[in-house]
């Protein structure tokens, strides 16, 4: 269905109160005044742009067909019409580096979107990227390296008070069947947040010169599993460092926050 046809179907749900609003996504170079007026007319409240990168060279190499300036222009126009702005970025694109992704995140933060999605690049069969991978011209991220990078990005967006509504591809939808290489994991965000917590725990231990032995790590209740890590990997890592860690819920700690005390101090 074309725009107005889709609008006729969805707008009635906004009008009768079934939906609070409609979210859609599109390319940055698809936004103009006419499109904004149509979206507004049919009850769209949030628009996400597939920015993917703010490096013009990376965009060119991946044949995205738009520029970083297109992202800036479209973002400003959408906000001027009162839409909630969402931006999507990808890590590990062909020709991209971790530094490119960090710079992309900084540029996205400067545009002040309400939401962000982060997608590590995944190589699927029967694509140009698959041919580049098979020829050795493209080396995709590993799950671990992508999780380390995305952990940094999550912290950046959190500090900027921007909500990350998705990290990593959804499981299902045919991804597993076509998957060839790259950073795909069905619980990717959990991996990233596990990285955040173990990195913060190690940093806290070093900064406070906590001696080896039994420790208690205080985190928010909903962060206990993240601090523990998948298959208890964070607990095991601390064990290797000489720390027997117990994790407890603490209402005084916020998102991505923790503090550690020696068990003997209780």
Locations of the language-model features?
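Conserved non-cysteine loop/helix-boundary elements of the Radical SAM core domain that shape
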Residues: 1-118, 125-144
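Auxiliary Fe-S-binding modules of radical SAM enzymes
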Residues: 135-266
